[in-house]
């Protein structure tokens, strides 16, 4: 679903996610279903992780091109797109947390994230401790060994623009660390380079950038992204190929816009 690269992010933004057709513009594949060679092949596809040409809730070539581009930009092994930024946030939390688990989260965060952590998470028995993200030590101090599954931060935060010490966050051992890097974009920072487990974007905003795509995306190591993908096909917050095409077009202009 992606590969690490050593190119400058601005160059990657222009070239990442291109297919083999030679087209400079993102290609659109609106298909929802693909044929197979037989029943055995269908069974194999249904069990495969992120099978591109099976069923669009599992994967889609246009969406996959966008995912490849984000993985390259974030310098991670893989990426996974969702129907929105909140689709990404809720899928990460619900894929990795169960009743009785604990989350440490930044207090000054996006209103939708705050509502999700205070609402559905509480109803599902997932406890959340909120900390001041401007003091990175508070994240580590709030971790409960063996119980805290996620440490969640935004940098810069929306809308207060609070910054988080990414090195300190990446150094936390035990829980999976998540940084919403929407307002920075990969051209401003790459949290995974500091040891953060998952980088998250509401790509509707800076990445897509043209007000014509609603889409979210996460990036991280292959195994972790694959685990979240397994939940995402049940959660159903699948990215549209039309939005992925527009978002990938937006990524091409990212450096010029910033």
Over which residues does each language-model region extend?
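N-terminal glycine-rich, Lys/His-bearing helix-loop that initiates the first secondary-structure elements
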Residues: 1-50
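Conserved PLP-enzyme active-site core in the AAT-like
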Residues: 2-4, 10-19, 78-258
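Conserved N-terminal alpha-helix of the aminotransferase class I/II PLP-enzyme fold
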Residues: 36-87, 112-119
